[in-house]
Design a protein with these regions (language model features):
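Motif-centric detector for short Cys/His coordination patterns
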Residues: 1-67
Length: 67
């Protein structure tokens, strides 16, 4: 997944929910803007769940769904 694509999804206004599937089979759904964080270069993103935070390397993203 290209960093530019992820940045576009995260920064679009208004925010629209989307999900990702990783190369290890894990899936994460970003339902609102506060569910995701990233440094300025977007080479990693952070998923903020109810009781967890997961660091995700954007190179491990295979699919974006629900855009």
């Amino acid at each position: 997944m290209k960093v530019k694509e992820i940045k576009g999804l995260v920064e679009r206004q208004p925010f629209r929910p989307f999900g990702i599937r990783l190369n290890n089979g894990a899936q994460y759904r970003f339902k609102e803007a506060r569910d995701i964080g990233a440094p300025k270069d977007y080479h990693i993103i952070i998923y903020f769940g109810e009781k967890e935070a997961v660091l995700i390397d954007t190179d491990s993203i295979l699919e974006v769904f629900g855009r």
